[in-house]
């Protein structure tokens, strides 16, 4: 594996994690600032759609990793994507809002995708 392959994947995932945080911030502003439930739900759907495409979008970068890491990354990203796809099928804004956050998550802590970015960076 090239160090660049892990770095490229980590960079991509970091960009996606930042996009998710931005969507979440917009959703919070919409619901708390405007009381717009429909707008909030639309933002949660946007978040879930972005995450549901994660495994597919990252695939070329994952394939550049050495086989063991590629398999590990593929499985992990597929779990993120499957959870998001399920949340879209269920249609629950609560489920969508909880994506990437374990039950014990505290505000200010990194979410699961941000933690995974750090793990992928450690591969390089």
Predicted regions and their residues:
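Short, solvent-exposed, charged loop/turn and helix-capping segments
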Residues: 50-79
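Amphipathic alpha-helical binding modules
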Residues: 78-124
């Amino acid at each position: 594996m090239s160090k660049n392959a892990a770095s490229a994947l980590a960079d991509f995932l970091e960009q996606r994690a930042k996009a998710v945080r931005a969507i979440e911030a917009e959703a919070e502003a919409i619901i708390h600032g405007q009381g717009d439930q429909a707008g909030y739900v639309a933002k949660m759907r946007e978040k879930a759609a972005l995450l549901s495409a994660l495994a597919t979008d990252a695939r070329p970068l994952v394939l550049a990793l050495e086989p063991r890491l590629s398999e590990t990354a593929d499985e992990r990203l597929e779990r993120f994507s499957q959870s998001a796809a399920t949340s879209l099928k269920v249609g629950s804004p609560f489920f969508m809002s909880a994506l990437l956050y374990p039950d014990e998550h505290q505000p200010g802590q990194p979410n699961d995708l941000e933690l995974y970015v750090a793990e992928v960076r450690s591969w390089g």
